[in-house]
C-alpha cells in the first residue's frame, strides 16, 4: 500500500498539482529531513506547509513532471528513485534568477508511512547536477 501511496503523491500532488490529494496521503504533521531549496536544514512541517512547498516548487517549475523509475519497500519505509523534469521559469527556485532552461534531476526519496500517510521524509536530490544544467559554476 505505501508504494502506491508514495507513487500517487508524486503523480497527483507534485506532477498534477492536485494539492487536495495531500489530505489523504500526508499526515497532519511530518518530519522532513531534506534540506530546503534555500539550504535550510530539515524541519517539522504541517500538511499546509507541505502544500505551500509544493505550490512554490510548481510556481518555479510550472511544467514539473515526475517519473518514478524504481521503488522498494521494507516495513513502513518506501524508497523511490524518481526523475523530475521541467523548465526553470518561475521564482528562482534554485537560489538564482530563473533561466528558462530545461532541467532533469534525479532524486532518491525515502518516506515512512503510518496509517497510509507519509509521516517522515528523506530526500537526496542531485542539486549540483541541476545547477550545472542551469549554467551556474559551483
Report each predicted region and the residues it spans.
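C-terminal and inter-domain tail/linker signature
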Residues: 1-138
